[in-house]
C-alpha cells in the first residue's frame, strides 16, 4: 500500500473525517495528496515522494520559500536561547518596533497565533473603543474560523452573529445603508483589502468604497479594521490600502509575516491604544519567542529585498502564459485579483467540472494548482519554474480539450456549494 493511502486509512480512525479545516482535501479531486513529507523553496513532496511546484504556499504562509535560510537561521538562534518561557523574550519588543516601523498606520502591535485570533481581537478592541456592539462586514467574506465568521453552520448560534450587519463589497450605497442600520451602536467596519472568496472571482477595491469606509468610521467615531491576514505583505510593503491613501485604525496580520512560523498580529493606531488595553487577550503560545524571531527576519527581508517585484514578475508571466494556452486550446480563462494571488476559473464552467479536470491534469505532472481557492506566488518561484509549469499546464489543457465532452459535473464533493451559488461567481 502506498504510504499516503496508509496514512489516510490511519487518519480516518483517529481524526474526525481524516482531516479538517482549510487544508482538508475532501473537496479537491481524489488524486490530491493530503499529507506532505517535506518542502523546500517553491516545491514540496508528498508522503510517497512525488514532487510538486506549489502554487498554494501552505495557503499563504510561505512568502520567501519553504525553509528560507535567513529566517531559519534566526529561528535556530532563538531556539537555542529559549522559546515558550514564563515571559516573552526581548525579541517581542524588537518585533513590535519592526512592525510599527514598517506599517504606516501602526503605533503599537500585539501578537497571537492565527488569523482568527487577530480578527477576533480586532472586533473586541473595536467594541471596547466606545462600548458599542455593531460591526459592519462585507457579506460572505471570510475573516476566520470563529463562530462569528466561519462558513460552516455546525454549532453556530444566531446569537454569535446578532450584532453583525452586512454590506456588499465595493458597493458604497450598501455600506452607507449598513452603517445607518447600526446607528449610534456602530463599533467598527471590518473589510479585506480586496475581495478574495473561494469559488468566486476576485475584485480589487474601488477607491470610492475604501475612502467611504474611512470617512464613515471618522464620522461615527468607530474603528476601521483591515483584515490583512491573507494579503498582508503580498501586495505592498505596508498595508494594502496605503497606496490608496486610506489607513485603518486596526489591521490584522498572519500567514506570511513569519514565513511559515506560527504567528499573527494585531496592529493599531494611537487612537485605538486605550481600547486595546481593555479586553483580556492572551494565549499559552502567543508569546513564544521563536516565531517572533522568524518574523523579525522576515520583515528585514521584506524591507530590504526585491521580493515584491519578483513575485509580480513571475506572477505576470504565469498569468500571460496561461491565458495564451487556454485560448490556443479553445478555452476562456478568467484570472482575477493581483498576479501575486491569482484566482483562476474557467468562464464556461459554472459547475467547475473543467477546472477540476484541469488542475488534476496539472497535478499528475507535478504542478499543484487549486480549482476554487486563490493561489499564492512566493519569492522562491523562478522564471524557470514558471516555464516548467507552463509546459505541464499546456499538456493539461490538451487533455482537457480531449476529455471535456465526456466530463460529468459538478464534482460530487462540491455539488452542494455549486447548487447554492446557482452560477453566481461574482
Question: What would you call each of these model-derived segments?
Answer:
Residues 1-426:
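Conserved N-terminal phosphate-binding loop of PLP-dependent enzymes in the Aspartate aminotransferase
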